[in-house]
Structure formats: structure tokens, C-alpha cells
Amino acid sequence: MKIRKVTAADLKLGMLIPWNVYGENGALLVRKGHMIASANQIDYLVERGSFEDHSGQHEAPREPDSALRKLNAASLELHALLQAVSQRAAPPDLRRRLDDVALLVTDAVAVNADVAVATILHNQRAAPYAVRHCIDTAVVAQLLAKAKQLSPEETASLTLAALTMNVAMLEQHQRMQDSRLELSAADRAVVQAHPEAGVQLLRLAGIADQAWLDCILHHHENEDGSGYPLRKSGAQIPPLARLLALADRYCARVAERAWRKTMTPHAALRDLLLESNVTVDGNLAALLIRELGIYPIGTYVRLINGEIGVVSRRGLQSTTPHVESVIGPRGAPLEVFLQRDTRAELHGIREVLSHAQLATLQAPPLRMEQVWGRSAAV
């Protein structure tokens, strides 16, 4: 065993520190198992920290990665970065730090895509809406990028655009989320201007990736030319912006909002398909449904036998996903969740439950780890 200084290579966002870290005077700075949640923490530990290096000795089994933990770490870091950019006080290493956030999202999807998708519905209190919505959109954008077989460079530009698309309306976005009032004329003007204003802020912060910036500029354009800010249509809209627009609109519709009724994932996908070639590209809307399924992961459903459960993973067909029943047919919460294959007659899906229906059940809050295991650990 030897004492070794912490280096930047030892740490990355979202990781659980595998050792106790001590300061120069031997005081404990952070305990083993602490999660790295920001680049500032990394800088602090590199500057001050040392640890007992047990390399070569028998190591304890490594804790499995958690997709949920990675996405929460991404939200924490992204919040600070977006605030800095919006205040024209971006750090000089902004691009690197945003790349690190994008990598956390990529890693989360790679660890468990089902958990990453489920967080869109089941992790809505983890960060302010204006930040969390960007993380959610980046998750869906990653799935679409993989389905479209985009290059690594295109996928990176799309993901970074999703993370920063609303940087010019952070304050208004959060206020709209919490308010039951209609938008004021001033707020409406900010919303209409935010694609162009966001591009300007990012340019001022040193971002020069044109594909990324074009994606943000066009993510509110519509297929029929009725969008904003440039009223472009069809092939005039960059392909990456079309993907971002679709991911953005799906995630916005399923989010809890004070000012409008929350849509079920099933209904949100149906609406996007009905809007084919008016607001969104019809082929891409169909692709989104293929990727998420008719019953996206995390959807609450009622089964034929009366049980209520959560869609936990895809089935052999989009109409027959696997479900974890969490409430019994008589309305009592189940102490042990029951795995149900909805191909079975009694376990078929009767209906998708709305947010209002769920509110009447008075069931205990669902911990994602109960359904998806350690890859959904906090």
C-alpha cells in the first residue's frame, strides 16, 4: 500500500469514488462511495486529495453501473453550465465539460436503455424542469441517432444540441412549468426568439460546431413551414434538427406541467404520428414509435386481471411488453412486485393509465430500483 495523489485520470463525472480521499493534513475529504457530481469536485480533489493505493491487492467486487445515477450526475453538472452560459459567464473549458455531460448520457443509455427511457417518466423531481427536459430529450435523441446509424460526430452534435437547446430561456422555461397562467406577451417573445438567442449565447461561449448550432436554430421549425424562427419547411430543415424536434416534443408532452394536462406516453406518440408531415417528419415519427414501442418503458398500465403495473422492458412484439405489477387487482400495493408477460391472456394490457388516474390510487411512490434493479440505483 502507498499514498498517492489524486489525478484527473482517476476521476470522472458520475463515478463512485473507490477509496477514501484525504487532505494534506490527513483529514478525510470524501468517503469511499461518494459520487462525483461536478467538474468542480474533480478539480478540488485533484488539487488537495490523496488516497491509499491498494493496486495489486485483492479488490472488492465493483458495484454495477447505474444509468439513473449517471443521468442525475449529468443533470447536476448541466444545470451549472447552462446557468453560466445564460449569464454570459461560461467557463473557458465549457466544451470539454459539456462533452463530459453528453458522455454521461451516452453511458447511461449504454448501461441500460430501458432505465434511461423510464427516467423520463419516473425521475421528474431530480432537477429543475428546464434542465431535466434537456437530459430527457438527449436520451431520446440518442435512441434515434442509433436507429438512424448516425456517425459519432453527428450523434455528438445532436446530443449537445439537446442539452443546450433552451439555454436562452432557462428562467422562462422553469416559470412556465410552474405557472397555471397563460404566457405573457414578453414571455411569448422570449420563447419565439430562444433558438436564435441560444445560438448567439453559445457562440459567445466559444462553441463553433455548426451542426450543433444549426440543430438548435431549427428545432422549432415545422414540416409545413409554420414553425419559428425562420419558417423553414421540409428539406430546408437540417436532418439533425428534425430528430431533435421530435425528441423535444415527445418529452415535453409526457412531462408533468402545471399549465396543461400531462399526456400519457401512448397518447403523445399517437399525437405525433397524427401530426406527420405537418409539424414533424412522418417517417421519423414512425421511427420513434418503433424505438420506444407502443407502450414506452415506464408507462403505467392496467392489466386484464385488474393488476396495475409498470412497463419494464420490451417484449417480442410492441403490443406485448413485459410489466411489473405493483398494485393487486383489489387495489392494494404489492409487497413483492410480480413480473407479467402480457402475451398471456389474463395479463394482457387493458388500458394505459393517465396521470389523473394514478393520483387516485394512493399507491406508495415507486422507487425505480424496485423495478429495474441496480442499474436504477440512486
Region locations from a protein language model:
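Terminal helices and disordered tails flanking the catalytic cores of nucleotide-processing hydrolases
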Residues: 1-102, 258, 262-378
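Residue-level signal for pocket-adjacent positions within structured domains
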Residues: 6, 16, 24-25, 31, ...
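A short alpha-helix capping/helix-coil boundary motif
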Residues: 19-22, 120-121, 177-179, 247, ...
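Alpha-helical scaffolding flanking metal-ion-dependent phosphate/phosphodiester catalytic sites
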Residues: 33, 137, 158-171, 186-200, ...
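Short helix/loop capping segments that flank catalytic or ligand/cofactor-binding pockets
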Residues: 39, 153, 254-255
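Juxtamembrane/interface motifs at transmembrane-helix termini
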Residues: 51, 176-179, 211, 233-235
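Acidic/His-rich, divalent-metal-binding segments that scaffold phosphate/diphosphate chemistry
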Residues: 58-192, 196-199, 203-209
